[in-house]
A protein has these predicted regions:
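Short, small-residue-biased leader/transition segments that mark boundaries at the very start
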Residues: 1-8
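Glycine-rich, basic loop-to-helix element that forms the pyrophosphate-binding segment
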Residues: 3, 71-87
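Short, well-formed alpha-helical segments that are part of the catalytic scaffolds
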Residues: 18-32
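A conserved acidic beta->alpha catalytic loop
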Residues: 29, 44-53, 96
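Short aromatic/hydrophobic "clamp" motif used to bind/position activated sugar donors
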Residues: 92
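Conserved donor NDP-sugar-binding/catalytic core segment of glycosyltransferases
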Residues: 104-139
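Conserved nucleotide-sugar donor-binding catalytic segment
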Residues: 135-220
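Catalytic core of nucleotide-sugar-dependent glycosyltransferases
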Residues: 209-211, 221-247
């Protein structure tokens, strides 16, 4: 039936890792969606709790369509790749397992999507994230709709706050995360910035996604994560340094590159090759100072341009 084939057009994707006591909120919010035609794809990133029992019980309830995929522990970015490769539909909505959606979340996405659906300049739509009390994560904004690239929105206009990304699956298939063996943390900005160079997004100022975390302060684990996966961090910052962005943001990217480069086992000449000799001469000493401070306290609050997690 056309209704059945229509289900696959929209997919809510959730990577899970040992969050069995939290995923119930998200499940309940999916059950109460005003718009019913969607599939929930869950990729389990090698959980050690029995979250699969919970998901099987959801599947047995048979109230929404759920696809459950297991993978060896490889990090959220590999779970996203896996989800994208399994997704049959045209829209891919990334929702973390400890977050949940407003009742009309998918309905509003589908509403705004119709305006860019057949426009190849657009990679997708973005609604706003808010705290459980309804306040926006970041400053409130006054505009209703913005058509802009992610790089313009986030780095150049510097619009603070968190957005909920919904991408055309066909675009994401061309922008899978790189696979760097042995590293399990890659900020989503790697892919967001690459897409942002070539596509626009439709940003709509409606709260569609409820998150519980504090978005501002760089968490301790964020620094640790980048120290443990330095080659991903270096790739993000070297690409950021070459973007057409304000000078100060470029400088920050260069410093951050050399801040995490000492954690990488790459030969120095390869580190220099990735970002250029002048960057090495000018920014390596400053970056190295940050690295020494990171090593000392594993945490330093430099306002960081890029992904917050």
């Amino acid at each position: 039936s056309s209704a059945a084939s229509d289900v696959y057009k929209r997919q809510v994707f959730t990577p899970v890792y040992n969050r069995k006591n939290l995923i119930g909120n998200l499940y309940q919010s999916l059950l109460s969606q005003t718009y019913k035609n969607f599939e929930w794809i869950i990729v389990d990133d090698g959980s050690t709790d029995d979250i699969d029992e919970i998901i099987k019980s959801y599947q047995n309830e048979d109230r929404i369509l759920i696809r459950f995929i297991k993978q060896e522990n490889g990090g959220k970015h590999r779970a996203i790749n896996n989800g994208v490769l399994h997704a049959k539909g045209e829209l891919f909505y990334i929702v973390d397992s400890d977050d949940y959606l407003t009742k009309d979340s998918i309905e509003r996405i589908v509403f705004h999507y119709q305006y860019i659906k057949n426009n190849d300049k657009f990679a997708g739509v973005c609604g706003m994230k808010c705290f459980p009390d309804g306040s926006r994560i970041g400053k409130e904004v006054t505009w209703k709709i913005l058509k802009d690239s992610w790089i313009n929105y986030w780095i150049i206009k510097n619009i603070k706050g968190d957005v909920a990304f919904v991408f055309k699956t066909s675009v994401l298939r061309n922008y899978l995360f790189d696979d760097i063996p042995g590293e399990k943390f890659c900020a989503e900005s790697l892919v967001l910035n690459r897409i942002g160079k070539n596509y626009l997004m439709l940003f709509f100022n409606e709260k569609i996604y409820i998150a519980e975390y504090l978005s501002d302060g760089l968490s301790v684990s964020s620094i640790k994560n980048r120290m443990n996966s330095p080659n991903y961090a270096m790739r993000i910052y070297s690409e950021m340094a070459s973007l057409d962005i304000p000078y100060l943001k470029k400088i920050k990217a260069h410093i951050n590159y050399w801040r995490f480069a000492p954690c990488s086992k790459l030969k120095m000449k390869n580190k220099i090759k990735q970002i250029g000799i002048s960057s090495y001469i000018i920014f390596m000493p400053i970056g190295y100072l940050f690295h020494m401070k990171d090593k000392k306290n594993n945490y330093i609050d430099i306002r960081h341009v890029g992904s917050k997690r």
